[in-house]
A protein has these predicted regions:
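Bacterial N-terminal signal peptides
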Residues: 8-16
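GH16 jelly-roll
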Residues: 23-258
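Positively charged n-region of N-terminal signal peptides that target proteins for export
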Residues: 1-5
C-alpha cells in the first residue's frame, strides 16, 4: 500500500509539472478530445482566398505600431499579395529600426469557426500569428508561432483584458516548412483549437464574448520578452510568414458586423 501511495503521488507531480510546462490553464488537451469530429474548411467558408487577389473587407496597417512587447512599426508595403499568397514580412528600417506587417478585416466577427492556411516565420524573437481582437474591452483569441521553435504553436485568449491562458501544443512538424490549416471554434462556453482539422485543445473558463476583427501579423519582441519568444536575432532578417486563405463559418445569425 505504501509503494502504491508513493506511485500515485509521483504521477500527480508529473501531471502538475506537465500542465505547468505546457501552460495548461484548466483546459482540455488532445487525448480527452477524441470524440470531437474532424473539421476542415470547405471552399464556401473561405472569406479571403489570396490566389484570387486582394479580398474585399481587409486592409494592411501602416503606422508606428504598438508598445512593448512589440519592437517594430507596421508598414503597408510589408504586406504583399502575389504568387497566390499573402506574405507578411519583417525587415530592417523605420523609426524603431524594424518594420513588421499586420493585415486585418474591416468588419467584426462573432461566434463561429475561424481558420487559416499559413506558413509560420522562423527566426528567434519573431512572432507570426492568426487571431481575433476587439480593441476595448480587449477580448482576443490567439494562434501564435514563436519563431525560436516553430515545431510548436501557442494558443491563448483574453477576456476583458485578462489573459494568462497560454497553452503550447507540440505539432510533430515544422510549421515554417509548409502550409497547414489552423483554426479555432469559438462558442459562448468554449474555444476549441484545431490543427489540420484535428481538435487539439479546448478552453472552457472565462470565455470572450465581444465580436472582433480577424487579424494576422508578424513582429519582433523587445529584449525584455526574450524568455518568451527567444532573443531576437536581426541577422535572420528579412523573415516572412505566408497565408493562402482565411476561413469563417458563423455560429449565429448576424455574426458579421461590417
Amino acid at each position: 500500500m505504501k509503494i502504491k501511495a508513493i506511485f500515485i503521488v509521483i504521477l500527480i507531480i508529473i501531471y502538475c509539472f506537465t500542465s505547468c510546462v505546457n501552460g495548461n490553464a484548466g483546459g482540455i488537451t488532445a487525448p480527452s478530445l477524441g470524440g470531437v469530429p474532424m473539421r476542415l474548411t470547405p471552399e464556401e467558408d473561405k472569406i479571403a482566398v489570396f490566389s484570387q487577389g486582394s479580398p474585399d473587407g481587409f486592409w494592411a496597417r501602416n503606422d508606428r505600431g504598438n508598445g512593448p512587447p512589440f519592437n517594430c512599426s507596421f508598414g503597408r508595403s510589408n504586406a504583399v499579395i502575389a504568387n497566390d499568397v499573402l506574405t507578411l514580412s519583417l525587415t530592417k528600417g523605420g523609426e524603431k529600426g524594424f518594420i513588421g506587417a499586420e493585415y486585418r478585416s474591416s468588419g467584426h466577427f462573432s461566434f463561429g469557426y475561424y481558420s487559416v492556411s499559413m506558413k509560420a516565420a522562423k527566426c528567434p524573437g519573431v512572432i507570426s500569428s492568426f487571431f481575433t481582437y476587439t480593441g476595448w474591452p480587449w477580448d482576443e483569441i490567439d494562434i501564435e508561432f514563436l519563431g525560436d521553435d516553430t515545431t510548436k504553436v501557442q494558443f491563448n485568449y483574453y477576456t476583458n483584458g485578462v489573459g494568462g491562458h497560454e497553452y503550447v501544443h507540440y505539432l510533430g512538424f515544422d510549421a515554417s516548412e509548409d502550409f497547414h490549416e489552423y483554426g479555432f471554434d469559438w462558442q459562448p462556453d468554449s474555444i476549441t483549437w484545431y490543427v489540420d482539422g484535428k481538435a487539439v485543445y479546448q478552453a472552457r473558463q472565462n470565455i470572450p464574448s465581444h465580436p472582433g476583427q480577424i487579424m494576422m501579423n508578424i513582429w519582433n519582441v523587445a529584449d525584455t520578452n526574450a524568455n518568451w519568444a527567444g532573443k531576437f536575432d536581426e541577422s535572420g532578417l528579412p523573415v516572412h510568414a505566408q497565408y493562402q486563405w482565411i476561413g469563417y463559418h458563423s455560429a449565429e445569425e448576424g455574426a458579421i458586423d461590417k
